[in-house]
Amino acid sequence: MTYKRIDTSEYPQQLAQKADRVREMFRPFHLNEVEVFESPASHYRMRAEFRVWHEGDDLYYIMFNPETREKIRMNEFIPGSLLINELMKELISLLKPNDVLRRKLFQVDFLTTTTGEAIISLLYHRPLDDQWEQEAIQLREALTSIAKVEVIGRARKQKRVLYKESVTEEVKVDGKSYLSLQTENSFTQPNAIINQQMISWAKRHAGNNSHDLLELYCGNGNFTLPLAENFNRVLATEISKSSVAAARENAELNNIKNVTVVRMSAEEFSAALSGELESKRAADAEIHSFDCQTVLVDPPRAGLDKDTLKLVSQYQRIIYISCNPETLTENIHDLSSSHKVTAAAMFDQFPYTDHIETGVVLERKS
């Protein structure tokens, strides 16, 4: 929950500097071009977290200066969606006079969609009782004039969901819309516009195929479902139980029938595919029946481990989405004996920060 004050007029210059860094990063791989995808300069983040500061009768959101750790009062949040900013103001005005809802409240999390839905999570340093729930129900009703809002209370070893713990986002890719169930406290792409551009880029480079797609780290099916129409079948793996459930539900929601989602880590899948591990989940999914020639990976910051690198090196085409340039370049070097980079892109998922999201396509050398 750190925050540096931003000046939107500086965004074009910052984007250009970031793009230069990415071009330099890919220079050793002899690429002629790196596509750069620009974010909106403001109101691009669909989720945000704030600490709550109590000062007498006053109550307000804060974030911290990353260098000095100084508290910054947040009456608005320029990176946050317009809906986050609207809800911030209304919520704090409703919490201030409410002794039950404000007592030992220390954090508020917002998750919003482009379709006007939101989840507000209230985090406490105390157990939540029935009185809290009654007040929270009234709070939710008061906020419905702004958006379709769900309210969730969290405390140590406790979670109180009033009605639902998910919202439905509409992801628009190349003129087509996909519904995406997004669950509270599960990973979702923070920048909706950039996310749509990432999916579109991946679809373009995937091409239209008669074979199958393997996807590792599929999350809630963010890439899986739009790419399903590019392939005969899709075999997708994910370790998070809630994300697997969301991916399967999203496939049903969009009436996509050619996707199989398996709850396995990339390491487990690799071992099961090679025959080193007996797995009922792998057997039930009939993983050996798939004819995968393309693999899509969107790993955590640590990148791909040795076993997963060995696995992906067997495929004709690798589409690699990365949130860490260092581990990405290491992995590309590891794959350089079998594959070459044929396309690269920078997606400015996190404007005004040093964080860089990139995508590369690697093709097997002839």
Curated annotation (Swiss-Prot):
<comment type="function">
    <text>Dual-specificity methyltransferase that catalyzes the formation of 5-methyluridine at position 54 (m5U54) in all tRNAs, and that of position 341 (m5U341) in tmRNA (transfer-mRNA).</text>
</comment>
<keyword id="KW-0949">S-adenosyl-L-methionine</keyword>
<feature type="binding site">
    <location>
        <position position="238"/>
    </location>
    <ligand>
        <name>S-adenosyl-L-methionine</name>
    </ligand>
</feature>
<keyword id="KW-0819">tRNA processing</keyword>
<feature type="binding site">
    <location>
        <position position="222"/>
    </location>
    <ligand>
        <name>S-adenosyl-L-methionine</name>
    </ligand>
</feature>
<dbReference type="InterPro" id="IPR011869">
    <property type="entry name" value="TrmA_MeTrfase"/>
</dbReference>
<keyword id="KW-0489">Methyltransferase</keyword>
<dbReference type="InterPro" id="IPR030391">
    <property type="entry name" value="MeTrfase_TrmA_CS"/>
</dbReference>
<dbReference type="GO" id="GO:0000049">
    <property type="term" value="F:tRNA binding"/>
</dbReference>
<dbReference type="GO" id="GO:0019843">
    <property type="term" value="F:rRNA binding"/>
</dbReference>
<dbReference type="GO" id="GO:0030697">
    <property type="term" value="F:tRNA (uracil(54)-C5)-methyltransferase activity, S-adenosyl methionine-dependent"/>
</dbReference>
<feature type="binding site">
    <location>
        <position position="189"/>
    </location>
    <ligand>
        <name>S-adenosyl-L-methionine</name>
    </ligand>
</feature>
<dbReference type="Pfam" id="PF05958">
    <property type="entry name" value="tRNA_U5-meth_tr"/>
</dbReference>
<feature type="binding site">
    <location>
        <position position="298"/>
    </location>
    <ligand>
        <name>S-adenosyl-L-methionine</name>
    </ligand>
</feature>
<dbReference type="InterPro" id="IPR029063">
    <property type="entry name" value="SAM-dependent_MTases_sf"/>
</dbReference>
<feature type="active site" description="Proton acceptor">
    <location>
        <position position="357"/>
    </location>
</feature>
<comment type="similarity">
    <text>Belongs to the class I-like SAM-binding methyltransferase superfamily. RNA M5U methyltransferase family. TrmA subfamily.</text>
</comment>
<feature type="active site" description="Nucleophile">
    <location>
        <position position="323"/>
    </location>
</feature>
<feature type="binding site">
    <location>
        <position position="217"/>
    </location>
    <ligand>
        <name>S-adenosyl-L-methionine</name>
    </ligand>
</feature>
<dbReference type="InterPro" id="IPR030390">
    <property type="entry name" value="MeTrfase_TrmA_AS"/>
</dbReference>
<protein>
    <recommendedName>
        <fullName>tRNA/tmRNA (uracil-C(5))-methyltransferase</fullName>
        <ecNumber>2.1.1.-</ecNumber>
        <ecNumber>2.1.1.35</ecNumber>
    </recommendedName>
</protein>
<keyword id="KW-0808">Transferase</keyword>
<dbReference type="InterPro" id="IPR010280">
    <property type="entry name" value="U5_MeTrfase_fam"/>
</dbReference>
<dbReference type="GO" id="GO:0030488">
    <property type="term" value="P:tRNA methylation"/>
</dbReference>
<dbReference type="GO" id="GO:0005829">
    <property type="term" value="C:cytosol"/>
</dbReference>
